[in-house]
Every structure is written in C-alpha cells, then in structure tokens.
UniProtKB/Swiss-Prot annotation:
Transmembrane segments: 10-30, 50-70, 80-100, 120-140, 148-168
Localization in the cell: Cell inner membrane
InterPro entries assigned to the protein according to its UniProt record, in alphabetical order: YciB
Family note: Belongs to the YciB family.
Its membrane topology: Multi-pass membrane protein
Organism listed in the record: Vibrio cholerae serotype O1 (strain ATCC 39541 / Classical Ogawa 395 / O395)
Protein name: Inner membrane-spanning protein YciB
Function comment: Plays a role in cell envelope biogenesis, maintenance of cell envelope integrity and membrane homeostasis.
Organism lineage string: Bacteria, Pseudomonadati, Pseudomonadota, Gammaproteobacteria, Vibrionales
Length: 181
C-alpha cells in the first residue's frame, strides 16, 4: 500500500501533463504530494526522510515553476533531489554509517564491506540520474523529458533495485545444504 502511494503523484503529474500542460501538472503534483505526505502520516504515524525531502523539493521548485511560469524549476527539482540523495549517502558513508545499512540492516545481515559497496553504488546511481536528467531536460523537448522523468527514471530505479537485490542475495549467509539420509 505504501509503495502505491508513492506512485500516485507521478501518475497524476503525467496524466495532467498529457491532457493540459506542465503548469497544471505541476500544480497537481504539489497537491498530490502534499496529500500523499498527509495520508502516509495518518496511516503510519511516520513519514520517511526521502519522502519528506521529495515533498519539500516538489513544493519549493513546483511553487517556483508556477509563480514564475518557468518549467526549468520543475526540471531542476529532479536533479536536485537526486543530488541530495547522493550527498546524503556519501556523507553517511564518510561518517562510517552507510545509510543503506540503516534502512535495511535490521532485516539483513551483511558484512560491512557489502553495505559500503551497495551504498557507493547508489551514490553513483543517483549521481548518474541527476546528470542524465539535466541532459534530457536541456537537450530534448519537454514531452521527452516528461516521459523520461515518469518512465525512464522509474524503470532505471526498478532495474537498479533488482540488481542491488541480486548483489545482496549473493552475499547473504546461506544455510548449508543437508544431505538426505
């Protein structure tokens, strides 16, 4: 249910962009993200840091997009969110407490070197997405950027999550196989 809530603002943004324009879609994104945070808090009595950062960035850059009638701000929001995530993971790594381990370490037992590798991999992923977003936003038409934001980045995140899962699985402690007697 929680994951479904994460996609609703994105779906609304995409649909309203296709039927109207970037400004209607941005206004709806701000409203949907605000509602998403409220519903998440009402249901779980907690809002994750990543969701809160995304909400603040949507409100700030979406608001600037609407106030100044300039779609560059909503384009920048995507890059800035990814840069903030990459910096957060980098700082956590430098401090010796990989954030990825903090998020998943209660459920998974892995060596510190594996957590470190996963953390750095996500730093690189978020940094790459930030750079790629800038390229698409400023070298391709707005329609292409919206599709990239909604489908391209979502697909890339899904694939990278699967790859991370495979890497984690490879390093999980496995029970020795018992021989049939």
């Amino acid at each position: 249910m929680k994951q479904l809530l994460d996609f609703i603002p994105l779906i609304i943004f995409f649909a309203l962009y296709k039927f109207y324009d970037i400004y209607v879609a941005t206004g709806a994104l701000i409203a949907a993200t605000t509602l998403q945070v409220i519903v998440t808090y009402a249901m779980y009595k907690k809002v994750e840091k990543m969701q809160l950062i995304t909400f603040v960035m949507v409100a700030l850059f979406g608001g600037m997009t609407l106030a100044l009638h300039d779609d560059n701000f909503i384009k920048w929001k995507v890059t800035i969110v990814y840069v903030v995530f990459a910096l957060g993971l980098t700082i956590s790594q430098i401090m010796g407490k990989p954030a990825i381990k903090g998020m998943l370490g209660k459920e998974l037992t892995l060596p510190d070197a594996v957590w470190s590798t996963i953390n750095w991999a996500w730093v690189m992923f978020f940094s790459g997405c930030a750079a790629l977003n800038l390229y698409v936003a400023y070298h391709l038409p707005l329609d292409v950027w919206v599709n990239f934001k909604v489908f391209g980045l979502l697909a890339a995140t899904f694939v990278f999550t699967l790859l991370t899962g495979g890497y984690i699985y490879k390093h999980l402690p496995h029970e020795p196989k018992q021989k049939n007697q």
